[in-house]
Amino acid sequence: MNSRFNEIWWFYPSASGTECDSYVAFDYAENIWTTGTIDRTAGVDRGVFRQPFWIAADGILYEQEVGFDYGGQAPFAETGPIALGVGENVMAVRGMIPDENTLGDVNATFKTRFYPTDTERDYGPYSMANPTSLRFTGRQIRMRVTGNTSSDWRVGIMRLDAVAGGRR
C-alpha cells in the first residue's frame, strides 16, 4: 500500500524466480494499472514512519519515496503510437513545446513509421528547449522522454506542432 499516491501494490516472483522480483500496482483514484520489476518482499505504508519502508530479498531495508536513485538506468516515459484520425493521414511534425520542470535534464526522441509493420525510424535526441524545432513525418509517431540519472525531473503536457500531410 502507498496511501500518498492512492496505490495498492502486489509483489510476486517471476517465472524463473524464487523471491518476489515483480509487481502489479493499482492506482485506485485514477483507475490505472502498472507493472514492473523491483526486488521487494514485504513492506509497511507510511503512518508509523514518514515514508513507506520495504525490504528486499537480500535483507536491505529501503525507505521508499525519498530522493531519486535510478540504479544506473536512465528513467524514461514513452507514449503509445500517436496518429491523426485513424491513421489514414501522414503527420508532419515541425516543432515541440515541452513542459518539463528541469530544463536540460530531459531529452525527447521520436520513432515514426508509415505502416503498422514498417520499420521504425528514429529521430533525436532533442533537448527540451522551449520551443524545439523538429522535422519528420509518419503515420504513427511515438515519443520517449529520457531523464538524466543524476537529477529529479517531471514532464507535463507536451505539445507538438503537427499538421496532416496527405494520405500517401
Predicted segments with their positions:
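Beta-sheet repeat architectures centered on beta-propellers
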Residues: 1-168
